[in-house]
């Protein structure tokens, strides 16, 4: 299975196409049946990002959802958006792209003040790490803007190597937002980094949920590691996918029609430090 995955991956890398495509499709996360919380607010964000900084006009989009419960917050790929966001090669099961944040799940425990992150597609098993909450140190500005009918206020912060401009609304008094961006006196509805390589914008806010949405713990088996190690693995994987295949499969993939000893793919992570 892994060998087939990497041969498919390499064929994508070597192929010449006019459109961007996912180079590392992985299966979606699976979740336990027993919930850890019930969502009282659901926010869907559209994330636009540039996978290759050398081709800034080629942007990709993903829909991700933020589920807020009394104790837990979960940020993940939007299950309802699968029809638009997934790739499903002929003869295969459901796949999601590794690029961006689709292959990651973030669960924040507001009581303990820590976040657990799960990442698929970079090791034989899923990897996970836990970190103490370290929200951006926001500088709140006086400027306001109307977004989705809400009056939003501007804030700026440097965080994990990028400088962000966020717009939050105190009309929804929850100190949350997309990905790891939180800590403002209101929900973040829009946020963009200074290079416009990553942009999040809320496209749906549901507070009176017609159907109960549970926040479920991740079921997949995982290896516990650190954020630094995960970022190093991701960087190395993109730098040399042949060696990455050897690590995961136990032997180096053979590429028909190519004598290349190293094959690299573009890598523009949201975390730069």
Roles of regions detected by a PLM:
Residues 22-273:
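Extended soluble regions of mature proteins
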Residues 1-31:
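Bacterial Sec-dependent N-terminal signal peptides
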